Amino acid sequence: MVYKTKLGEMEISDESIFTFEKGIPGFEHLRKFALVFPQETFPIGWLLSLEDPEVGLPVVDPKLVRADYDPVVPSEDLEEIEAENQEALLFFCVLTIPPGKPEKTTINLRAPIILNQKKKKGIQTILENEDYQLRHLLSEEMERSKTVV
C-alpha cells in the first residue's frame, strides 16, 4: 500500500508495519508505524508514522554503534508486546541529528524502540541499565566500540 510519510510517498508492505498500543513518548496519539531502510540513508532506518506524515524518527541498530549493547527490558514491556523473552526482538535506538551539524548526532541508548516481528507490536521502553543515557555522542560511542570488539 502507498502511504504519505515524512520521506514522501512510499510503498510499504504489511510486514514493515508495527502497532504501538501506547504510542511513542511525544506521539502517544499515533499507533501505526513502519520501519523502513531507504538505500540513501542505510544503515540508518526510519520509524515512520502511517497516521501523521510529519512524524518520522531516524533509528539505527544499537549494536552497530555500541558492540556491547546489552539491554535489560522490564518484564511488563515484554508482556505489552507479547514477547516471551528478548531473543527474538529487534532493537533500534533513536538518533537526534542537529540540522547542519551531523558530527553532533546523538543516540538514545536508554530508551530503545523494541519490535516484536512475530506479533507486529512495538514499544519504546526505558531500560533498567544505569550505564545507558538518553544522549550519547554517536562518534564517541562508535570510537569506544572499536576498543570493545
Curated annotation (Swiss-Prot):
One of its GO terms (biological process) is regulation of translation. Belongs to the FliW family. NCBIfam families: PRK13285.1-1. GO terms for cellular component: cytoplasm. This is Flagellar assembly factor FliW. Acts as an anti-CsrA protein, binds CsrA and prevents it from repressing translation of its target genes, one of which is flagellin. Binds to flagellin and participates in the assembly of the flagellum. It is found in: Cytoplasm. It comes from Thermotoga sp. (strain RQ2).
